Amino acid sequence: MRMNIYNNGIYQQDIESAWKLGNFNKLEGSRILITGATGMIASVIIDILMYYNSIINISSQGIHILAVSRNEEKARERFAPYRDSDFFTYFSHDISQPLPELGDIDYILHAASNTHPRAYATDPIGTITTNVSGTYELLSYAAEHYCRRFLCFSSVEIYGENRKDVDKFGESYLGYIDCNTVRAGYPESKRLSESLCNAFAAQKEQDFVIGRFSRVYGPTMGKDDSKAIAQFIRKAAAGEDIVLKSEGNQLYSYTYVVDAA
């Protein structure tokens, strides 16, 4: 699915539409570090920014992207069209470890995380350390290098289970999470990553924003994505029956990936 994404007319139209909605001139000359670069949302953000770079005047300063992920082979394939661009730099790094010296970074987008149930189950330690240690290391770098803004990719999972006292969650809602389960590592560590942002703002005056993304879907979903919506789409595309593991009465918010980006 990802191999042919640059040849998909619908996806390219979506990228162009997203560019038209943004005011990217304000980012001219900026250096933007994006972690989890090959992930569902981050890869779309990179495509949008690189689309902007492809149509700007030759004298423009452009937007410089530093893309970070763990799987270099996957990244080389995903971002092959940008390999020779002066505006794109990729490096492989475990963000739970301190960053190498990269110079000043204007914006950091922390999108690296295990984001589907199978990953939580098979790599619970990595899930927690990426969300907690990774956020700490990135915030530390941001604070030391006068980063203008830090964007933390969080999740609606921080709201926990509905206590049956509301029909819809507000931003201040906190439901139940059983912390003595492996599955709790994801929402609990996302909660802590948000707390770290607030701590750095209070102690280091680091500017930040948090995006609590709902259930995101779209063409950049990985083939190994085990979330329900990903399974539903794969089944439907293959002409197979969709299998529900519940009565299907729950109400969820879904966001198309380009809208999320």
Please tell me what each predicted stretch does.
Residues 81-97:
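Rossmann-fold cofactor-recognition segment
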Residues 31-51, 55:
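N-terminal Rossmann NAD(P)H-binding glycine-rich loop of SDR-like oxidoreductase domains
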Residues 1-33, 47:
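Non-catalytic terminal and boundary segments that flank Rossmann-like NAD(P)-dependent oxidoreductase
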Residues 107, 123-137, 180, 184, ...:
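Glycine-rich NAD(P)-binding loop of the Rossmann-fold in SDR/ketoreductase-type enzymes
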Residues 162-172, 185, 195-261:
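NAD(P)-dependent short-chain dehydrogenase/reductase
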Residues 136-184:
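Conserved Rossmann-fold NAD(P)-dependent oxidoreductase catalytic core, especially the SDR/UDP-sugar
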Residues 35, 68, 108-114, 150-156, ...:
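SDR active-site strand-loop-helix element
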